[in-house]
Amino acid sequence: MAGNSIGQFFRVTTFGESHGIALGCIIDGVPPGIPITEADIQLDLDRRRPGTSRYTTQRREPDQVRILSGIFEGVTTGTSIGLMIENTDQRSQDYSAIKDVFRPGHADYTYEQKYGVRDYRGGGRSSARETAMRVAAGAIAKKYLAQKFGVQVRGYLAQIGDISCDVVDWDQVEQNPFFCPDASKLESLDALMRELKKAGDSIGAKITVVAEHVPVGLGEPVFDRLDADLAHALMSINAVKGVEIGDGFAVVTKRGSENRDEITPQGFQSNHAGGILGGISSGQPVVAHIALKPTSSITVPGQTINRQGEAVEMITRGRHDPCVGIRAVPIAEAMMAIVLMDHLLRQRAQCGDVVSDVPRW
């Protein structure tokens, strides 16, 4: 079955291709009475939108969202919400040279082998352009989470290449095109991007996303653990090759005595687990990290084959990002928000009447 949907109670289905007429999504399970406008959704779409800085693809799409259904007089009605974004700046001619050639590192070869046909224009369905609708759906989830539970979901660029960015100032994240929380690293990041553009090459990145004030109890053991669903959602983002929850792979070198999150009457003393224990949220901040590969759409010549199996030298044309991780921050936020909203609705349905005497912090 086609994997175009995510979620059970809060279910998001997306459709559309990079160079098609439009992108869209259907969102089921949104409770009625939530104030939502196109402007609310547009705020996050503008953060992801291409062509807004010299460090990202120069494809200029307004990404203007249209609400088709499910919202009346500014509030959700409880019925399916339909959203659409028109594609306006396609340059399909840029891809005519790869019609019969498989770009190395891309989905061209695997899509062709799976379906026997592929839309070669900008990667078709495999393009990161599809994530615009995830961000649109995530904006609705973020609004619900904040309004009903005080949950705040936000992300930042944690690393590009060898340049690491610590959280010095959360406010700084929205003040620069890198989503970097450390202003002292901006000059180095700018120099790296210039170097990559000159060389026609690309670089990978690490993004961190944090959800604060998440209620205790979210997650459905054993197969729908909160961390399992988060890993699934984040791993589905284009170019993501790794997901960590909490300290992730760093736990390999730790002792149990230092990794366990000890509890006192005042609360947890650490958060190595990333806010999830036994697949269930602990009430601490939920923390996840994703690693994104360097894009293969570069002008450095590389080896591949054509449809006839003949050796071909490949140079990718078109408009591309030297680091796809830069625009991944709002996408990662959206996927975490979608998963959290789905689990909040599932928790309310099954355990809404449960009252525990155990302290919460």
From Swiss-Prot:
GO cellular component: cytosol
InterPro entries reported in the protein's UniProt record: Chorismate_synth, Chorismate_synth_AroC_sf, Chorismate_synthase_CS
Gene3D superfamilies assigned to the protein according to its UniProt record, in alphabetical order: Chorismate synthase AroC (3.60.150.10)
Binding positions for FMN per the UniProt entry: 125-127, 238-239, 278, 293-297, 319
Entry annotated with the keyword Flavoprotein: yes
Assigned EC number: 4.2.3.5
Keywords attached to this entry: Amino-acid biosynthesis, Aromatic amino acid biosynthesis, FAD, Flavoprotein, FMN, Lyase, NADP
SUPFAM superfamilies: Chorismate synthase, AroC
Official protein name in the record: Chorismate synthase
Species in which this protein is naturally found: Yersinia enterocolitica serotype O:8 / biotype 1B (strain NCTC 13174 / 8081)
Name of the gene encoding the protein in the UniProt record: aroC
